[in-house]
UniProtKB/Swiss-Prot annotation:
Function: Promotes apoptosis by binding to BCL2, hence preventing the formation of protective BCL2-BAX heterodimers.
Subunit architecture: Directly interacts with BCL2; this interaction prevents the formation of the anti-apoptotic BAX-BCL2 complex.
Protein name: G0/G1 switch protein 2
Phenotype upon changing R57A: Reduced BCL2-binding and reduced pro-apoptotic activity. No effect on mitochondrial localization
Expression induction or repression: Induced by TNF through the activation of the NFKB pathway.
Gene this protein is translated from: G0S2
Stated consequence of mutating V38A: No effect on BCL2-binding
Segments for region (Disordered): 80-103
Effect upon mutating F36A: No effect on BCL2-binding
Length: 103
């Protein structure tokens, strides 16, 4: 059934057979569902590039946020290490001065 023109005679023939009226309803239901499927597929095809671009932007934003968090964490760690070195220097100087006085 390549064209719609072939469907019309088929529907008339099926309507002529009174016992198979349920089959006509079934074919009509199937045709309507197939048409909805085609329309939804076309909509998805048309809208797909926009959703893909949005996902890509969201992913890039998440990566940038993660990198910023890692940089902040590295700076905090570096600041703590420098503070620890300063305290070690101060404590080391006190220990040397105590030794000099004790001798």
């Amino acid at each position: 059934m390549e064209t719609v023109q072939e469907l019309i005679p088929l529907a008339k023939e099926m309507m002529a057979q009174k016992r198979k009226g349920k089959m006509v309803k079934l074919y009509v239901l199937g045709s309507v569902l197939a048409l909805f499927g085609v329309v939804l597929g076309l909509m998805e095809t048309v809208c797909s590039p926009f959703t893909a671009a949005r996902r890509l932007r969201d992913q890039e934003a998440a990566v940038a946020e993660l990198q910023a968090a890692l940089e902040r964490q590295a700076l905090q760690k570096q600041a703590l290490q420098e503070k620890g070195k300063q305290q070690d220097t101060v404590l080391g100087g006190r220990a040397l001065s105590n030794r000099q006085h004790a001798s």
